[in-house]
């Protein structure tokens, strides 16, 4: 597998660096467990709601992939990638899965693209339309929207958990009131989600995605047949362990999964982010080749 697109993808985000990493910093929230030096105790026991369920509420950011792991992945391309300086988007500040969900697969073992997926990629590439949806001020594809630099916020309430994404100021609603998934949902950017608790793990099922966004920075496509299963477990005050499974039989030969950890952004918050305000990037991006490997 080739990783040239990682370097070019970092360079692309250099044009959008004003949209990443904005946070309200250093506003000490009341009721947080703290160590003797006044910092939030990230290893304290996970909080719970009145009904005894773990409380996922808080501002979170995916754990970055280590420099050592990036060196292993990129090999002799690491130095070139490391020279690209984008605030909040350095090679040691993002998750490898934001660039490619298949990063852990050995060549030939990853789910194969169905003919429809290959045709879609070639069509968009030949038309010069192989680009991120955020370049047109549309929502970034999920899960890429939370696997790169932007922070997000869980707001947990009875019957519903809301995920607020700083990137584009969009949101997901996860209904936990026992309702079933709809039989014929209206396709949308973030789909229709229901959740239930299995012990201390929130299990989320999502269907009803549209086919307009990419799953990751390697331009892996999705279809309206995608079904995504997420499992969130807050192991302590400062960490959520998450697993995501993607099943899209129209695009891929088999389901695939990733596991990540989300880190609490203590005493912080998300900021307003209006893409269309002073937008200057789009006219420079049409037809840009990011080194995609269609395999």
Question: Where would I find each of the regions flagged by the language model?
Answer:
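Positively charged n-region of N-terminal signal peptides that target proteins for export
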Residues: 1-5
């Amino acid at each position: 597998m080739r990783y040239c697109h990682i370097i070019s993808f970092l360079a692309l985000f250099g044009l959008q660096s004003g949209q990443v990493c904005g946070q309200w910093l250093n506003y000490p929230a009341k009721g947080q467990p703290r160590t003797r030096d006044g910092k939030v105790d990230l290893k304290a026991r996970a909080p719970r709601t009145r009904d005894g369920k773990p409380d996922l509420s808080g501002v979170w950011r995916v754990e970055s992939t280590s420099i050592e792991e990036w060196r292993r992945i990129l090999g002799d391309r690491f130095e070139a990638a490391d020279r690209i300086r984008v605030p909040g988007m350095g090679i040691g500040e993002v998750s490898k899965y934001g660039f490619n969900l298949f990063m852990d697969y050995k060549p030939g073992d990853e789910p194969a693209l169905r003919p429809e997926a290959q045709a879609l990629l070639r069509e968009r590439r030949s038309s010069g339309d192989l680009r991120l949806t955020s370049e047109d001020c549309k929502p970034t594809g999920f899960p890429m929207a939370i696997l790169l630099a932007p922070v997000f916020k869980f707001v947990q309430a009875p019957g519903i958990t809301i995920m607020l994404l700083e990137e584009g100021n969009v949101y997901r609603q996860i209904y936990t009131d026992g309702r079933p998934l709809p039989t014929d949902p209206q396709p949308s950017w973030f789909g229709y989600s229901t959740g239930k608790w299995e012990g201390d793990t929130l299990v989320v099922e999502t269907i009803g995605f549209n086919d307009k966004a990419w799953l990751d920075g390697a331009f892996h496509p999705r279809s309206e047949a995608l079904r995504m299963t997420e499992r969130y477990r807050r192991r302590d005050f400062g960490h959520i362990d998450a697993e995501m499974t993607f099943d899209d039989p129209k695009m891929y030969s088999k389901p695939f999964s990733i596991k990540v950890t989300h880190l609490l952004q203590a005493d912080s918050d998300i900021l307003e982010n209006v893409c269309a305000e002073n937008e200057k990037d789009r006219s420079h991006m049409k037809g840009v080749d990011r080194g995609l490997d269609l395999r």
